[in-house]
Regions:
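Mid-to-C-terminal alpha-helical segments outside catalytic/metal-binding sites
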Residues: 2-22, 29, 34-35, 41-116, ...
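Generic structural signal for well-ordered alpha-helices
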Residues: 146, 220-224, 283, 310, ...
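Short, solvent-exposed loop/turn segments at secondary-structure junctions
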Residues: 26-28, 163-166, 183-187, 239-244, ...
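Non-membrane alpha-helical structural segments and their capping/turn regions in soluble enzymes
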Residues: 210, 214-217, 225, 272-276, ...
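Active-site gating/metal-coordination segments in enzymes
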Residues: 2, 116, 121-292
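Histidine-centered catalytic micro-motifs
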Residues: 19-29, 293-300
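Catalytic pocket-lining loop regions of alpha/beta-barrel enzymes
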Residues: 244, 258-380, 387-389, 429
Length: 438
């Protein structure tokens, strides 16, 4: 493919820019110390997509075993059993690469590996073990995960969403600023009710009040205030994985009556009502703590994750800065209606470039044209490992370079404006939103 001179010139500039990520699920250092190509794939989007059965976090005995818990699908990743016959293993790997090597997740993960480990060509059965060995050797250095993010990924900073341990900064507070997740508080009104990550506040915090709803809310408020005082920079909801993101107004009395009802005492409809109250309560807390509220939209429970379902909440809380994640994919054009009409909407293209690179290019073209301000567009990798994060950065930089080059060539703006916009998209917008001093 012949690349235009404009693309090559803008790409050279973009490739050297640092990034700030709005969203990571980066796994602890101890996990990375045992990393291989197989465990990397297991804890990646292609692993989720392929669907190897994984251990749930609540059943683990230590954080070095943390793995992404998702529903199993039909196809499995190649076996990582060292006792497997070499011929069988080679065949499994070849079939895996043939079946999934064209998927955007795999393409960008592989480009991340190439950038870090310097091998030429593509991953294949013949070089699988040697690349895996390189990964293992690199990660014997306990500093490797952050070194890779900073060196190959050009990361300045990242917002960390440790859904297995709310508010956790991975013991790297200078690099990771945590989110304050709301999911289990929205979903669980009793220890018999768990959110999609198998969490409940009544399990995570054994001393949490259960006899009085006011005391319960006070406990949560103090918990979030403490997180905020210790470096948390945003609130985060991924409840779209289990319910609609249309949150109706519910009065306090109704929610109080539903509080601490067990699974066999409460209907699904009443669980939604309770969650509606709690989510609205958190919107008020977000305003009080003066932090943005990150909202998962798209690609979850598809019937309930369309970004337009969230409009009433956006309108209800004009003082809350809502960060709409994932471009609302696959409804990335529809999210523009919200960005056009509401100045408290920040479009975050987190995850989108590795879901569909072509879709992300189309989306960014439109966002630049329609967003109320060029300051209201951002990005995050949304990955578990440094290797996949680097791939996600490369995908984002490709998308930005391609869009800016096409805008320049179309006469939409000139090269100097493109350079300014590139800096905003790479790090300045996120730095301003989360108040990082860069």
């Amino acid at each position: 493919m012949t690349l235009s001179t404009t693309f090559r010139e803008i790409s050279e500039i973009v490739s050297n820019l640092p990034v700030i990520s709005s969203h990571e699920h980066h796994l602890p250092d101890s996990f990375h110390q045992n990393l291989t190509l197989d465990s990397l794939l297991e804890n990646s989007y292609i692993g989720w997509y392929v669907g190897r059965t994984k251990k749930s976090i609540e059943n683990l005995t230590d954080d070095s075993q943390i793995s992404v818990s998702r529903k199993p699908k039909i196809y499995l990743l190649p076996s990582d059993n060292p006792q497997e016959e070499p011929q069988t293993l080679s065949k499994q790997r070849a079939e895996f690469l043939d079946r999934h090597g064209y998927n955007s997740y795999m393409v960008w993960l592989e480009r991340g590996l190439q950038a870090i480990y310097g091998y030429e060509g593509f991953l294949k059965p013949e070089n699988w073990d040697s690349i895996s060995q390189q990964i293992s050797i690199r990660h014997k250095n306990p500093h490797a995960p952050l070194e890779i993010l900073k060196q190959q990924g050009k990361y300045l900073h990242a917002v960390q969403d440790s859904y297995w341990d709310y508010g956790y900064d991975l013991d790297h507070p200078d690099f990771f600023s945590p989110t304050m997740r709301v999911d289990m508080f929205v979903t669980s009104c009793h220890p018999t009710l768990l959110d999609h990550d198998r969490n409940s506040p009544f399990i995570s915090y054994p001393g949490i009040p259960t006899n009085n709803f006011d005391d319960y809310l006070d406990f949560i408020k103090e918990l979030f205030i403490n997180w905020r005082q210790n470096g948390a920079v945003a609130m985060k909801s991924a409840s779209a994985y289990e319910r609609t993101i249309q949150y109706n107004e519910v009065d306090y009395k109704t929610a109080k009556q539903l509080f601490y009802k067990a699974n066999d005492e409460i209907s699904w409809e009443d669980r939604i009502v309770y969650g509606d109250f709690m989510f609205n309560w958190f919107c008020g807390l977000s305003r009080e703590l003066d932090v943005p509220f990150q909202i998962h939209t798209g690609l979850a429970e598809l019937s309930g994750s369309h970004p337009l379902l969230f409009e009433s909440t956006i309108a209800r809380y004009p003082a809350v800065q809502f960060v709409l994640f994932h471009s609302g994919y696959p409804w990335y054009s529809d999210i523009l209606g919200l960005a056009h009409n509401y100045d408290n909407v920040f479009i975050d293209m987190v995850w989108a470039p590795i879901i569909s690179t072509t879709g992300a290019v189309d989306a960014l073209h439109q966002y630049i044209e329609v967003a109320q301000s060029s300051d209201l567009i951002g990005w995050g990798s949304d990955t578990w490992t440094s290797e996949e994060a680097v791939g996600a950065v490369l995908a984002w930089k490709y998308v930005v370079s391609k869009v800016l080059a096409e805008k320049i060539e179309a006469g939409y703006f000139d090269f100097s404006k493109a350079e300014v916009l590139a800096q905003k998209l790479m790090y300045k917008n996120n730095a301003a939103l989360y108040r990082f001093d860069y």
